[in-house]
Regions:
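Ribosome-associated RNA-binding proteins
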Residues: 1-131
């Protein structure tokens, strides 16, 4: 069974974009390839209790086990060491990505008190969005 957002995108949104912008086929239009969730731990990354609880939280949110990210360089001003834990990340693709986005847009974001929408300033020059 396909996720609801995926069906809406392929049956309604893509054909509308094709007609609006005059694309020769529907695959010339924009589409979402992946969603990456990142959680920075800062200096607490080496504390195993904090790391484990954050790992469990991110796994509950996404349904996938997160990957531990490490610092690439040592920076004295930030008191970081090369190879020490800096955070966690999860990459979602295909059906899990659409299910996550559907829950985020339709359930999680509307529950935020005084939510006024997402800012359009979150886009970079490559089409990525960060909030």
């Amino acid at each position: 069974m396909n996720p609801r957002l995926k069906e809406i995108f392929y049956k309604e949104i893509q054909p509308a974009l094709k007609n609006q912008f005059g694309f020769k086929n529907i695959y010339m239009g924009p589409r979402i390839v992946k969603v990456i969730l990142n959680m920075g731990l800062g200096l607490d990354g080496n504390d195993s209790k904090i790391l484990k609880s954050c790992e469990e939280d991110l796994a509950k949110i996404t349904g996938q086990k997160p990957v531990i990210t490490k610092f690439k360089k040592s920076v004295a001003n930030f008191k970081t060491r090369k190879g020490s834990n800096s955070g966690l990340k999860v990459t979602l693709r295909k059906d899990k990505m659409y299910e996550f986005l559907d829950r985020l847009v339709n359930i999680a974001l509307p529950r935020i008190k005084d939510f006024r929408g997402l800012s359009s300033n979150g886009f970079d020059k490559f089409g990525n969005y960060t909030f």
